[in-house]
């Protein structure tokens, strides 16, 4: 999407690793486990605050914008687009990829369905645009190009 839109791309998990990794922690999951939820969220917000001000596409973790400091940092950057996916597809992806550490931690106090519903509701509440991507075939260049074009049309409306 960033290539099609000709924008810089930032992946927040990659930025966490490049800013906070060490000999002991080489992935965002390891950093999350070592730092805990609150400190990890503070790290995310700090990174978002330090990104260059130009237009960019920023990939956030599913729980990032549940934290007010991260939301404030991203809110000033421009349009917030929620790339929405229906719950059954989210469950399918989580089953294939495994649960992120933040979800594992949150599931100590709430069921997964409640956590995901809260996240989706939050995104629907704060997003400037909601763009469904259930139908996008990520292995098809034409599908990705069509989705990118549809998103551009949405942003211009």
Task: Go through each PLM region and give its residues.
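ATP-dependent small-molecule kinase phosphotransfer cores
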Residues: 14-64, 69-72
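NTP-dependent small-molecule kinase module
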Residues: 4, 92, 117-157
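Glycine-rich phosphate-binding loop of ATP-dependent small-molecule kinases
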Residues: 1-26, 79, 150-157
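A glycine- and Lys/Arg-enriched "phosphate-lid" helix/loop adjacent to the NTP-binding pocket
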Residues: 24, 76-122
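Short glycine-rich anion-binding loops that position phosphate/pyrophosphate groups of nucleotides
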Residues: 62-65, 86-88, 136
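Well-ordered beta-strand positions
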Residues: 56, 79, 128-129
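Phosphate/pyrophosphate-binding catalytic cores of soluble transferases and nucleic-acid-acting enzymes
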Residues: 12, 38-39, 92-97
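A non-catalytic, amphipathic alpha-helix used as a structural packing/dimerization or gating element
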Residues: 39-46, 114, 118-125
């Amino acid at each position: 999407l960033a290539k099609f839109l000709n924008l810089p791309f930032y992946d927040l998990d990659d930025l966490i690793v490049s800013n906070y990794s060490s000999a002991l922690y080489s992935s965002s999951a390891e950093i999350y486990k070592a730092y805990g939820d609150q400190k990890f969220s503070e790290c995310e917000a700090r990174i978002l605050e330090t990104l260059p001000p130009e237009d960019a596409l920023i990939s956030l973790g599913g729980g990032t914008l549940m934290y007010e400091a991260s939301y404030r940092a991203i809110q000033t950057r421009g349009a917030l687009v929620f790339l929405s996916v229906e719950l059954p597809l989210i469950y399918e992806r989580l089953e294939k990829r495994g649960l992120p550490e933040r979800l594992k931690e949150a599931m100590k106090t709430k069921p997964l369905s409640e956590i995901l519903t809260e996240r989706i509701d939050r995104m629907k509440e704060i997003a400037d645009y909601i763009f469904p991507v259930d139908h996008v075939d990520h292995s098809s260049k034409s599908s990705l190009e069509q989705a990118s074009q549809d998103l551009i049309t949405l942003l211009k409306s």
